[in-house]
Curated annotation (Swiss-Prot):
Gene: proA
Catalysed reaction, written as an equation: L-glutamate 5-semialdehyde + phosphate + NADP(+) = L-glutamyl 5-phosphate + NADPH + H(+)
Role summary: Catalyzes the NADPH-dependent reduction of L-glutamate 5-phosphate into L-glutamate 5-semialdehyde and phosphate. The product spontaneously undergoes cyclization to form 1-pyrroline-5-carboxylate.
One GO location term (cellular component): cytoplasm
Gene Ontology biological-process annotations: L-proline biosynthetic process
UniProt pathway annotation: Amino-acid biosynthesis; L-proline biosynthesis; L-glutamate 5-semialdehyde from L-glutamate: step 2/2
Species: Campylobacter jejuni subsp. jejuni serotype O:23/36 (strain 81-176)
Name of this chain's protein: Gamma-glutamyl phosphate reductase
Length: 410
């Protein structure tokens, strides 16, 4: 394993020699080969789906169809045309001694990405790594074994064409990743995408820095001044459009003075999706005779990521109580306020600590593609290095370039 990782690290210099046009060409070729061979990917995915016996969120994440593969290819093409971050000077100045000092963007180095389900990440991450000149080792989940292998075989075909095959590797066995975790002298950072248990296990077994994507316990607060029709559209989109994703809504907080009116609007729409309601005792009565499945909230309710047609609901007396609740229970992912009160919006966005804070918009926009990044390595809930959807610039670091004319320090 050490020899393999050392070889990848050594060969990563090839990525630094690529021009922006080279990277564009490679990523466009990758999109082309995936589009041309989508049937091979679908056949592999059928095997994984047949072997996967669980239902719910992970099954949806595992599934690939022609539409999702074509969307993946379009995303890769967007990544190809994004400005190359490597070598970019973000700022420069001269110091008192006349030294020219510039801050230059560079790759992080050798990145390990560990992910569950979501086999499309095998291609998306490869494109992001090529664009950012990072070497990478991949470890997909066993539930997506056949699909990951099919996609990475196509990725590797493109890499070989450009003599970059030694800059990347995919691992499929659990014991292999446990070995990798020991090489803190070779791996620069680990980006885990998966369950809280998986992320914690990795953190407990390595000294390598982690950029975590924690669970997506996303909140919405409907304020007293909210336009209720707009609020209804936002809540339905955030909760019901795609429940298996980390940017879906899990907890709804409603100002107590509009609770009756707003919940009466929600109920008929939630019936269409058979949304299960986990209500705080102060909200229970408003769902009486709704014909929805209603559960009284317990001590774990507001710390639960449902990833299902289920929603935690609580009434609050004001914006301050909503902020307090969110800061107590949030996973630091995405939160939104629906309000026409500029003061409350400003307070909400200033005082909540999560990585993405919306006003009058759905949390479903927390996504690299939606942010204009082309794709994402993950959505970081960490506070160090990167936060929110991680595009190309977020898998870069920097160095200082200093030029002088013989200066010495007195």
């Amino acid at each position: 394993m050490r020899n393999l990782l050392e070889n990848i690290k050594k060969n990563s210099q090839k990525l630094l020699n690529l021009t922006p046009k080279d990277k564009e060409k490679i990523i466009l070729k990758l999109a082309q080969i995936l589009r041309e061979n989508f049937k091979i990917i679908l056949e592999a995915n059928k095997k994984d789906m047949a072997n996967f016996t669980k239902s719910g969120a992970m099954k949806d994440r595992l599934l690939l169809d022609e539409k999702r593969i074509l969307a993946l290819c379009e995303g890769l093409e967007k990544i190809a045309y994004i400005e190359d971050p490597i070598g970019k000077i973000s700022k420069g100045w001269k110091n008192y001694a006349g030294l020219s000092i510039q801050k230059m963007s560079i790759p992080l180095g050798l990145i390990c990405v560990i992910y569950e389900a979501r086999p499309s990440l095998s291609a998306e991450i490869a494109a992001l790594m090529i664009k950012s000149s990072n070497a990478c080792v991949f470890k997909g989940g066993s539930e997506a074994k056949f699909t990951n292998e099919a996609i990475f075989t196509l990725v590797n075909k493109v890499l070989k064409e450009f003599d970059l095959q030694d800059c990347f590797a995919m691992f499929t066995q659990r014991d292999e990743i446990l070995q990798i975790l020991a090489f803190d002298d070779l791996i620069d950072v680990i980006i885990p995408r998966g369950s809280s248990n998986m992320i914690q296990e990795i953190a407990n077994n390595t000294k390598i820095p982690l950029i975590k994507q924690n669970k997506g316990l996303c909140h919405a607060f409907v304020d007293q001044s909210a336009n209720l029709d707009m609020a209804l559209k936002i809540i339905l989109n955030a909760k019901c459009q795609r429940v298996s994703v980390c940017n879906a809504l899990e907890t709804l907080l409603i100002h107590e003075k509009i609770a009756k009116n707003f919940i009466s609007l929600l109920i008929p729409e939630f019936k269409k999706f058979k949304v299960k309601i986990h209500a705080h005792e102060n909200a229970l009565a408003y769902f009486n005779n709704s014909n929805l499945k209603i559960f009284k909230a317990n001590e774990n309710t507001f710390d639960t990521e449902w990833l299902d047609f289920a929603l935690s609901v609580k009434l609050v007396k004001d914006c301050d109580e909503a902020i307090e609740h969110i800061n107590k229970h949030s996973s630091l992912h995405s939160e939104t306020i629906i309000s026409n009160d500029a003061s409350n919006i400003a307070k909400f966005q200033r005082l909540i600590n999560s990585s993405c804070i919306y006003a009058n918009a759905s949390t479903r926009f927390s996504d690299g593609g939606e942010f204009g990044f082309g794709g994402e390595v993950g959505i970081s809930t960490s506070k160090l290095h990167a936060r929110g959807p991680m595009g190309i610039e977020d898998i870069c670091t920097y160095k200082y370039i200093i030029n002088g004319e013989g200066q010495i320090r007195e």
